[in-house]
Each structure stands twice: as C-alpha cells, then as structure tokens.
Swiss-Prot record:
InterPro entries: aa-tRNA-synth_I_CS, Arg-tRNA-ligase, Arg-tRNA-synth_N, Arg-tRNA-synth_N_sf, ArgRS_core, DALR_anticod-bd, Rossmann-like_a/b/a_fold, tRNAsynth_Ia_anticodon-bd. GO terms for molecular function: arginine-tRNA ligase activity; ATP binding. It catalyses: tRNA(Arg) + L-arginine + ATP = L-arginyl-tRNA(Arg) + AMP + diphosphate. The keyword Nucleotidyltransferase does not apply. It comes from Shewanella sp. (strain W3-18-1). This is Arginine--tRNA ligase.
Amino acid sequence: MKSHIQSLLEQTIESFKQQGILPADFEARIQVDRTKDKSHGDLATNLAMMLTKVAGKNPRELAQLIIDTLPASAFVAKVEIAGPGFINFFINDSALADQLQNAVNDEHLGIKLPTPQTVVVDYSSPNLAKEMHVGHLRSTIIGDSVVRALEFLGHKVIRQNHVGDWGTQFGMLLAYMEELRAKNGEQAHLELSDLETFYRAAKLRFDESAEFATRARQLVVELQSGDEYCNKLWREFNDISLSHCHEVYARLGVSLTRADVHGESAYNADLEQVVKDLDAQGLLTESNGAKVVFQEAFRNKEGEPLPVIIQKADGGYLYATSDLAAMRYRSNVLKADRVLYFVDLRQALHFQQVFSLAKLAKFVREDMSLEHLGFGTMNGEDGRPFKTRSGGVVKLVDLLEEANVRALELVRSKNPDMDEETLAEIARVVGISAVKYADLSKNRTSDYIFSFEQMLSFEGNTAPYLLYAYTRVAGIFKRVTGLDLSQAKIVLEHEKEKDLGNKLAQFGEILNRVVDKGQPHVLCAYLYELAGAFSSFYEACPVLAADNDEQKNSRLLLSQLTARTLQKGLNLLGIETLERM
C-alpha cells in the first residue's frame, strides 16, 4: 500500500516536470509514512513542503496541486490537506480487503518482491583459536536474520563466514600442539572442551619461553610457505574448532554451514598481489618500515593523517590486507551488488578506511555497495560487558545451557502435569528464542543489558509472549473441523478488523526496512504490534461465534493470515514456533 502511494506521487512529480512546475532534472525524495492518528488517514507525506522552494509555491497551494494531479486509484478513498501542507491518504477498505485476499494463497503473503540482487553477507566470523563466547552472539544472529529476510524477498544471498584461521597466533598454537604430540604420541588430540585451556597454555608458553616463541614464529613462516606437516596440524586444529562452532550454530538455529566458511586463509595467496597493485598505483608510503596508505579524508584529532597499514615492517600482513583481498574477490568473482559486514561498531573507522581504499584502488566495482552494519555491546546488569562472576569471558554454550535450564523451570511451573519429553522440547525452543529475541529486538547500534528475567517474561515484547500469541491464534483452527475457506472472502467492517488488516498489510514494507538497513528490531516491533492488534480484534470480533458464516469465514481468514505472518516473521528471525506451550 505504501509503495502504491509512492508510485502515485512519482507519477505526479513526472507530470510536474512536463508542465514546467519542476525542473526536468529534479530528483525528488518521496517519503510516505504511516499516520499515528487514524483521523488523519492511513498514510501521509510532507512532499508539498519539500517541494515548495524549488516549485516557488506555498506548501498548501502545492499540496492542492499535487492532489489535483494524482492519478486515479481504486486504493485511495480520499485525500486531504492537513496543517501547513501535509497530504493525508485514506485507504479504501475494499482495496485493503482485496490486498489481504491476494495474500491468503500467496507463499510470500502478498508481498511485491523487489528486483533481485546478489548480496554477500559477512557475519559471525569467530577466531578459530578459542571457543565461541557471548561476543560472537550479535554478529551471528543479527546477520542470520537479515540473510533469511533477504532470501525470502528473492535475493541471491552468499553467506561468508570470514573466520580468523590464519596469522601469527596459529604458530603459537601449532608449536604447543607439536609439544603435546612429542610427549603423548600421535594419539594426543585436542578435545573441544579444552580449547580455552589449550589456548591459554600455548600463550603462557609463548610469553615465558624464548625458545618456544622462536619455534612458533618459525612455524608461521613454514605454514605460510605451504609446509605439509604444518598444514596438516593447522587443518586438524581448524576442524576441531569449526566443529565446535557448528555445534553452537545448530543449537542457535543459525543457517551457516561448512560450505559458507571462507576465512582469512582463503586470501593468503592474494595478499602479495594486493601490496603490488597498491604500490603500482602510487598509493603506498613507507612509515617506520611498514607499508601504509594515507587517505586525505582520514585524520586524527590533531589533524595528522591516519594510516591503513598494509604490510608490517617484518613482512607480515594485517586485517586490512586480507579485507581488501576479500573485497576484490567478492566484487570480481562473486559479482556482489551489496556486501554487508556485521561487525562490532568499534571497527567503524577500520571499515570506513578500507571501503574508501578499495574504491580508490579500483579493487571493487564502483556500483558495488559496501556496508558496515555495526552493533553495540551486550552488557551485564551492572552496565559493563557481560562476564562470568569471576570476571572471565562467558562461553556461548554456557549461556545457552543456562537459558535452557531457566526455561525448563518456567515451562514446568506453568505445566506441572506435562510429560518430561514435551517439557524439554518446549523449554529448548523457549530458551534459545528468548536469548535471540532479546538481542534482535534491540536497535542494532545500541548497547543493551542482558537479563534472563526480562527475556523469559510472558509480558511485553519478548519471545515467550510472541510464541504464546502464535499458539493462541493457531489454536483457533484446532477447534474447527471440516473447514473449507477456499471460497471465503475477507470483508472489513468492524474498526478492529480494519486495524488488523492495516497491520497485516505492512509486513512487506517492514521486511524491506530489515534488508535495506539491517535492522531486525523493526521486525520484532512489528510482530509485537501485530500480536496486539490481533488480541484487540479477537476481543471485539467473535470468530467462531460470529453472526453469520460469511463473517465467520472472513474472520477465520484474517486469523489464518495473522498466524502465517507471525510464524513467518519469527522464522525470519531464526525462531521456531510451537503448537502448544
């Protein structure tokens, strides 16, 4: 509906250009918003006020001219001017009912699909030296929800799990594994539960033993040179680490697979060429023995230029080098239209610099969009980064296990007679969903306080509330036998039917915001509002006890569409639904 009004306004702008009211080369930014007060219609635009200067007319006069020039539309019941020049659109109830009717049998719920693009999404990307911790949660689940929405809207999505599987720390890890093998024989292997212990022990040896540190650096050189022995150990370590990651992904219900792993090591052979190409373009400068690039736009508070370090004085490469190689690969090989990076906001300057450099060096096509979709931190109730009571990093598996235990207690307290198998399954879904939804429902760029008590509440904008709301809607159909709605028509008569219908019709524009801005919290807010709209509708409009079959079937269709929208919306967030709670 919103896109339809935008289209009408675009046609009006073109007419104004032809009439000479606006310059022929003028490009208008058309904004259409939902009204908060229904007495002001369903949709509104401030276009007249935006055009008043260039058109040389006062806003209300221009608003009337826009209304007079608008193409006729069956969707629009009436158009009014409000205040200094706002234009309010009242949508025709029968047109809204027709739109909802079309959604009933459509797998995309009546959403008009955009022109498909190839979108590379870089998310999760843990270092393979340690177990995944809570710091990996946000990138993993925010990225995954946006990926799901992109695919649902018909885009070709290429997931890229840019794991940290290369670099100097691997020499340290390989050297320590070599020592363990020497002591315990070839049968010695690293258990998943020992990853953290192993890493700390290797780091301790590296810091305390000069001989060990020398061997670690030697192994890095041998690894980078393709030494078969080093590569064998390196692959084994990565396999163990990746197995752990994918156990966490499976538990989280995240769609990443082994095939999506394209880590730093994948670009190792390209790094030397990156340096050569930057040098050939005259972009490299030597600074304290390192090879760097200075860009005029990036300076510190003192006005001094900030470098992008491409190669260290000892010949080693940095994140910027592999990021540039990855961008070139994603442009030239993957042919991406957009590349989305779900990485901590604290890396904002890094991405601004490498995005700018990639375009400057022509490593990527000019029309390829590079987007850093950063996020804030997850904090404890003291407002500081989330830690264990002893001050250590919280492992992601431990967090999810505690969520499961707490959810089991909650579900058991509400269903004391339920069998253990069913309780366990419901608790699994509720626990994981609560953790994911609590994160996804917050604005991506904000820090937030992690609270089990809040996220497991059945009140407010939480996963348990929405899971219950879905079971309540779906439960209506369990009380009906022999239902045939194939000939049923949606009719919007009661005000609460219209409110629910209007909310259902917004699903497409909400998903477009999710994929355009990388903002799953917008979808969370929408689903919460949809559940509320259905609750108001259900209280005011009897469904199974409606006055007649036509009204009953219409309300059943609205209920069915609500259930499908809630389920699809939750699934796009990576959240399973339940048939009972």
